[in-house]
Structures are given as C-alpha cells and as structure tokens.
Design a protein with these regions (language model features):
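Conserved SAM-binding loop
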Residues: 41-42
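Class I S-adenosyl-L-methionine
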Residues: 57-65, 77-199
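Short SAM/SAH-binding signature in class I
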Residues: 65-71
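Conserved SAM/SAH-binding beta-strand->alpha-helix loop
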Residues: 34-35
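Class I SAM-dependent methyltransferase "Motif I" SAM/SAH-binding loop
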Residues: 8-14
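Conserved SAM-binding strand-loop segment of SAM-dependent methyltransferases
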Residues: 47-53
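Short beta-strand element of Class I
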Residues: 27-28
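Extreme N-terminal starter segment of soluble prokaryotic enzymes
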Residues: 2-6
C-alpha cells in the first residue's frame, strides 16, 4: 500500500500531524503563523517543513500530499463570538484552504497529463478535512448559511457547478453525508469529553 502524506493548514501545535502519525500517514508540511506553536511542531516533527502564512502560499508550489487538514480560526463562527461567520476576517480564512486545495489539484492534474497518466481518481490531494466548532452550523446571514457555503465550496473542488440544498427542516444535523459524481462529503460533531480532552 502506498504511504499517505499530509499537509496541515492552520496547524497550531500539530494536532493533525500527531493524529496522522498515529494512523500511518506521514506529515510532510504545515502552515502556521504563530511562533510558539511552530516551535512545538518543529520539535515534535523535525522532518515536517514549515511553509508559513496560508495567505501567502500557492498550492502549485507546495509538495504534493494526499490529505489536506485544517482547522481555520473559529472565533467568527463560535456562539461565544460576534458571529461574523465566514465574512469575518479570521473564520473567512477557510476559503484559503479551499483555494490551496484547488491550486494543488490543478497542478497535479497538469503533472499527471504530462506523464500521460489517467487523472480523474488520482488527482491529489484526494482528501480534505476541515475542523471547526458546532457554531458553524448556525452562523451566517440566515441560520446555517455559512455551513451551506462550506459544503458547496468543498463539493466544488471536484464539481465546479454543484448546488447543495439547504438543511432539511431548516437546521443542520450533527452528522450528514453528500454523495456526488466521483466525490463524497461527510460531517460529524465529536464531543471532546469522550476523547479525553474536555473543553
């Protein structure tokens, strides 16, 4: 089996790289701007390259990975915040994650065509993980509009003109699945107290 590789955006102190190594996925690079968390990951994962500020990265220039994980800042989505949602300066950085994945896939598609390989199911990154707070389900101009945007933007990485219906009953459920042509998107709310890290 081919080894999976991880790129970690909004890396913090390396939670995604730690989870990856516990699941036989090799962390290759990370993006973070805060010095202390970067020092922690440099110590814990010396082989992982630090790429810096997500807003200054271009996906075509990043090392190819199979998985992109990111937990964009939650302050604008959180029920404890001002609820600016994805329009907020911090939580809106989610769109940078989508941009980078699209740029990486475009570059990988080009590379594979140059080598005359089949492309559709092998374009990398193949997987994207987004971690955030349950407040994402209810933020936005209309209740839950931001999570609707998240789902559409993630689906549009694979299918540019896809349209996702709003939540049945007007509210997003804590778990769900979207099946598309050659892609799927799933979401789950995990309660941290059951994972040994009550918050």
């Amino acid at each position: 089996m081919t080894e999976l590789k991880l790129g970690s955006l909004f890396d913090g102190i390396g939670g995604f790289p730690l989870a990856a190594t516990m699941n036989d996925i090799r962390p290759v690079w990370a993006s973070e701007i805060e010095p202390f968390p970067m020092a922690v990951t440099a110590y814990r994962f010396p082989q992982m390259k630090h790429m810096g500020d997500i807003t200054k990265l271009h996906g075509a220039n990043l090392p190819v990975v199979d998985v992109i994980a990111g937990g964009s800042p939650c302050q604008d989505l959180s029920v404890a915040g001002k609820r600016e949602g994805l329009a907020g300066e911090r939580s809106g950085l989610f769109m940078e994650q989508v941009r980078i994945v699209k740029e990486m896939r475009k570059q990988d598609r080009r590379r594979m065509r140059n080598h005359r390989r089949r492309t559709d199911e092998f374009i990398r990154p193949r997987y994207m993980l987004w971690e955030n707070v349950p407040g994402a389900f209810s933020s936005g101009e209309t209740h839950g509009a931001d999570f609707h945007t998240v789902l559409e933007e993630v689906c549009r990485i694979k299918e540019a003109d896809v349209s996702i219906p709003g939540p049945p009953g007007g509210a997003w459920t804590p778990a769900g699945l979207i099946m598309g042509e050659g892609f799927s998107v799933a979401w789950r709310v995990l309660d941290a107290q059951f994972w040994g890290v009550p918050q």
